[in-house]
Design a protein with these regions (language model features):
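Acidic, glycine-rich flexible loop segments
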Residues: 32, 40-166, 170-327
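Periplasm-facing N-terminal accessory domains of Gram-negative outer-membrane beta-barrel systems
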Residues: 1-55, 301
Length: 327
């Protein structure tokens, strides 16, 4: 008699995940062997951390407003999208230009984003969350999966006490594959804002891009590249208090040039020489995102990869100050 050999295969491991597999050795004759394939999900008893995986199928197929894939973080329990409560607006120097999430009751500033194991920061002043001036986290096609880990995680994570969001970029395969797309949204089908006048303010958003991946050398050297562009012209509904027409007409000649700097009244009089002026100044946003990745399979057990990611963006947000020259 001897111990029967045990073998388990088909146990997937995702980013930031560990599993403990217990095998029971039994006495048997030398000609008996037990093999188990495609085992069901194993309960994680090796750590006490709370985690949630968002896989490639969810990232690619679930609808997203603006193609900002970090919105899918809210699929996990204990996550609240805190973006609407932040101060400032898109294109301004606020606490963060990307989306913000309160996870397990902690502040959004406590979270840490990792891209392929490296800290992933954005364009904000304090670099809390990734993202450009559009307020989106672009690169949906470039992401294979991401995992959100919170609460009593291991010492392999650190720097911030909040959730750790680990993002893994997509890689090439032995077959060439690619995609091209454009999402268009404009004001033709939009409703008029309560403060708008007879015409609907301009709103045009173009989300476009392409990706391609495949083999450089089959089974050995693979590549993947992705580009995504974002263009938005948004008419902001602006209500300003200005001198009324009667005040302009009664002003002395030396004051007339100063009053000319204010918008012309096009709303009702409020009394005391003040009236309302409605306008729709245009906000312009441009963002370009790109990433490339090369994988080299050194051996069945060793993999080397290199990835490069760039996000370049600008925003021109008009102000309500009548003396400003920005448009």
């Amino acid at each position: 008699l001897c111990f029967a050999p045990q073998k388990r295969i088909g146990i997937p491991l995702t980013v930031g995940q560990s599993k403990q597999i217990d095998l029971t050795l039994a006495l048997t004759s030398v000609d008996q062997q037990v093999t188990i394939e495609d085992t069901p999900s194993v309960v994680n008893i090796s750590t006490q951390q709370t985690s949630g995986l968002v896989d490639e199928r969810q990232i690619k197929q679930l609808p997203l407003n603006g193609r900002s894939y970090d919105q899918l973080i809210t699929l996990n329990p204990g996550v609240v999208n805190y973006t609407g409560q932040r101060s400032g607006s898109i294109g301004t120097s606020n606490s963060s230009v990307g989306n913000m999430f309160a996870i397990s009751g902690r502040r959004p500033q406590d979270n840490l984003f990792l891209l392929n194991g490296i800290e992933y920061t954005g364009a904000s002043l304090i670099n809390v969350t990734p993202g450009g001036t559009s307020g989106q986290l672009l690169g949906v096609d470039a992401v294979r999966e991401f995992n959100v880990v919170s609460d009593t995680y291991s010492a392999s994570y650190g720097k911030r006490q909040g959730a750790q969001i680990s993002i893994v970029t997509a890689s090439g395969t032995n077959k060439f594959h690619g995609s091209a797309y454009e999402f268009l949204r404009n004001s033709a089908l939009d409703a008029r804002n309560y403060f708008d006048q007879a015409t609907i303010p301009e709103f045009q958003r173009n989300n476009f891009g392409a990706s391609i991946g495949g083999p450089i050398k089959k089974d050995k050297l693979l590549f993947f590249a992705n580009y995504e562009g974002y263009r938005q012209n948004l008419g902001l509904s602006d209500l300003t208090l200005v001198p009324d027409n009667a005040s302009r007409a009664a002003a002395v000649p030396s004051v007339q040039p100063l009053l000319a700097l204010w918008p012309i009244q096009n709303g009702p009089d409020l009394g005391s020489g003040i009236a309302e002026a409605f306008s729709s100044p245009i906000q312009h946003i441009r963002e370009d995102f790109g990433t490339t990745r090369v994988d080299y399979n050194i051996s069945p057990k060793d993999l080397f990869f290199a990835a490069y990611t760039i996000d370049d963006s600008t925003a021109n947000t008009p102000t309500q100050n009548p003396l400003a020259l920005i448009n």
